[in-house]
Amino acid sequence: MAQKPRTVICVGDIHGYISKLNNLWLNLQSAIDPSDFSSALVIFLGDYCDRGPETRKVIDFLISLPEKHPDQTHVFLAGNHDFAFSGFLGLLPRPSDGSDLKDTWKEYSKSEETEGWYTGEGFEDMHLQGRRWAGKIKATFNSVKGMAYKGSIYDAGSTFESYGVPHGSSDLMKAVPESHKKFLTNMVWVHEEDDVCIETEEGLKHCKLIAVHAGLEKGNNVEEQLKLLRAKDTSISKIQHLSGRKNVWDIPQELDDKHTVVVSGHHGKLHIDGMRLIIDEGGGFPDKPVAAIVLPSKKIIRDTDNLSS
């Protein structure tokens, strides 16, 4: 008898909403066969912080999973928000090319004033995105998202507040517990699985899976991109695979006929197109759900589903 394919759960952007995460987890437990759930591979697609009110509690929840569900495998991808949070806390690895983290400022220096980059304690050796994350943006309203900014261009104010400090305060560096710093340090930029099953119109297919927060760039060599992500190359000012938009939306052409699933969050949309899975229905908005996709079935589970008893 053929072995049953392993269940893979990919969870979209959480953005500080602990109640949504709790409800989603209960719904996943209700919707999935108990033995499949207990042995599942669970990939969190990044963006745990910012926008919502309870980043601290979200990270506490994620840290608790390996002990509560020891037979599951948990993967925590870095989103662009989590990367910037880590950059502010001084948790990013040094650039392997010998450059300094402050060298990442130059490319975007024209935006320093309007984005109000952080200039407090420790800024001199901080990655660009850490400075942007803790900065104080001049504009008060984000016209693209149709909502007010929460402190910075990243809406990081709510993350500071969840740790009991005001936005932009260097006190956050001491307020974040060591267990949270370890979690942020250990996040991966990409996760690869050689054999994941997915249901298609032609039946069940065995595929490679690549999970990365925003996606892979369409026109560039895939292996070179994966090398950069595996190595966590912090010499780059803006990492497209974590923060790009149109340029990382599609599957790279060289993967078109290679049975490779590319799964991401980030884009504020739920988009299922063949082997390209984008799971971010919530986008950090208070009134939108946090969603997950379950493989092989491609079933979508949301925190708003009335499944748990």
Curated annotation (Swiss-Prot):
One of its GO terms (cellular component) is cytosol. Binds 2 divalent metal cations per subunit. It is an enzyme of class 3 (hydrolase). Disulfide bonds: none annotated. Changing R51A: Weak activity for the pTEpY peptide HTGFLpTEpYVATR. This is Tyrosine-protein phosphatase RLPH2. One of its GO terms (biological process) is peptidyl-tyrosine dephosphorylation. Changing K238S: Slight reduction in activity for the pTEpY peptide HTGFLpTEpYVATR but strongly increased activity for the TEpY peptide HTGFLTEpYVATR. Weak activity for the pTEpY peptide HTGFLpTEpYVATR. Gene3D superfamilies: 3.60.21.10. Its cofactor is a divalent metal cation. Its EC number is 3.1.3.48. One of its GO terms (molecular function) is protein tyrosine phosphatase activity. It catalyses: O-phospho-L-tyrosyl-[protein] + H2O = L-tyrosyl-[protein] + phosphate. Substrate binds at H15, R51, R132, K238, R245. Coiled coil: none annotated. InterPro entries: Calcineurin-like_PHP_ApaH, Metallo-depent_PP-like, RLPH. The active site is at H81. The keyword Hydrolase applies.
